[in-house]
């Protein structure tokens, strides 16, 4: 029997975890390497909304990848639940967007794509969300939007991979890529060298620094996003609420998340009073019962910003055997299933789910 091709996946966020899963299913021998603990960077800081919020604004490559991923999430969440015993709480919630200036663009998008959309008056919004009471106002309704409990999803993915026999080397920082004759040979870590036929970079905001020594200029940079959390009763809110790049969602437990900021501050992950005050104000506007309430938690994560938010998926011409799945900006959770499948298709030589050209790392 032929030896399996070996792969080292660098970075164990949601993109790295699903990449490892898809590559294992494609017949590769996979090892996942993580500088810290699984899913503790941008993935853990995400709200878990499985949408780009304003899908009609998305460039075509982002829209196609998002649509493929969204269509796969319900089955993926169920598969992961059965494989791990942990329910990631995939929830088909729908989304209410209060930016009525987007109506014409949203209507055109729906007609072009065939996606369901509705325009609700204040009375119809109040019927859907009684908690808004007299504060209900007209909205654009996207019934196909879902969300997932990201912490539970990350735990479930980690457990599922371990149950598949995929090694996860945590607290193992990669310091360089091993190379010989223009071919990636593995990685150098603080604990020693790890050899493999292929190396996949899924390190989010830290991706560019891992390959700069090869003259690869990957335009991925950190963008800080901060989120606050309130405690509410279960069932208070069913839909995701969205206005002006800000959102609010309620988990099944009653936790209410409000986000998010987008700050160019380098690798600074500090939380700020300014963000807390701004998001608290937004919370009171979107859900008036939160006016005057104090958030119980605040956190931040560094998203891997890239031009137009279009990720880099595929190989790079400067080093054979080096692959990328990074640069998803604020949509890593949304795009992870499709990104992982597309990369696995390319590495396995299968017909790809989407045209890979728009995502090329050396585009």
Q: How would you describe each model-predicted region?
A:
Residues 287-363:
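C-terminal catalytic lobe of FAD-dependent flavoproteins
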């Amino acid at each position: 029997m032929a030896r399996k091709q070996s792969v080292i996946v660098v970075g164990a966020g949601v993109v790295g975890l699903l990449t490892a899963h898809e590559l294992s299913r494609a017949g590769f021998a996979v090892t996942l390497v993580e500088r810290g603990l699984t899913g503790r960077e941008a993935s853990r800081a995400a709200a878990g909304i499985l949408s780009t919020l304003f899908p009609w604004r998305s460039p075509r490559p982002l829209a196609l990848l998002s649509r493929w991923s969204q269509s796969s999430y319900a089955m993926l969440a169920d598969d992961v639940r059965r494989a791990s015993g942990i329910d990631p709480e995939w929830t088909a919630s729908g989304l209410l967007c209060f930016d009525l200036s987007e109506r014409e663009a949203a209507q055109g998008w729906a007609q072009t794509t065939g996606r369901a959309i509705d325009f609700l008056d204040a009375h119809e919004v109040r019927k859907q969300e009684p908690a808004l009471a007299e504060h209900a106002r007209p909205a654009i309704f996207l019934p196909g939007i879902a969300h997932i409990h990201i912490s539970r999803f990350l735990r479930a993915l980690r457990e599922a991979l371990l149950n598949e026999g995929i090694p996860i080397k945590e607290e193992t920082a990669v310091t360089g890529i091993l190379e010989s004759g223009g071919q990636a040979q593995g990685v150098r870590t603080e604990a020693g060298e790890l050899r493999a036929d292929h190396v996949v970079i899924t390190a989010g905001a830290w991706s560019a620094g891992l390959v700069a020594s090869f003259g690869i200029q990957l335009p991925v940079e950190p963008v800080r996003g901060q989120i606050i959390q309130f405690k509410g009763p279960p069932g208070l809110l069913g839909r995701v609420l969205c206005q002006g790049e800000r959102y609010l969602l309620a988990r099944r437990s009653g936790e209410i998340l409000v986000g998010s900021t987008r700050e160019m501050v380098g690798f600074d992950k500090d939380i700020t009073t300014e963000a807390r005050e701004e998001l608290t104000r937004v919370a009171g506007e979107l859900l008036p019962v939160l006016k005057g309430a104090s958030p119980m938690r605040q956190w931040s994560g560094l998203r891997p910003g890239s031009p137009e938010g279009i990720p880099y998926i595929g190989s790079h011409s400067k080093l054979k055997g080096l692959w990328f799945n990074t640069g998803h900006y604020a949509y890593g959770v949304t795009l992870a299933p499709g990104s992982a499948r597309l990369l696995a298709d390319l590495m396995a030589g299968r017909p790809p789910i989407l045209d890979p050209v728009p995502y090329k790392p050396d585009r």
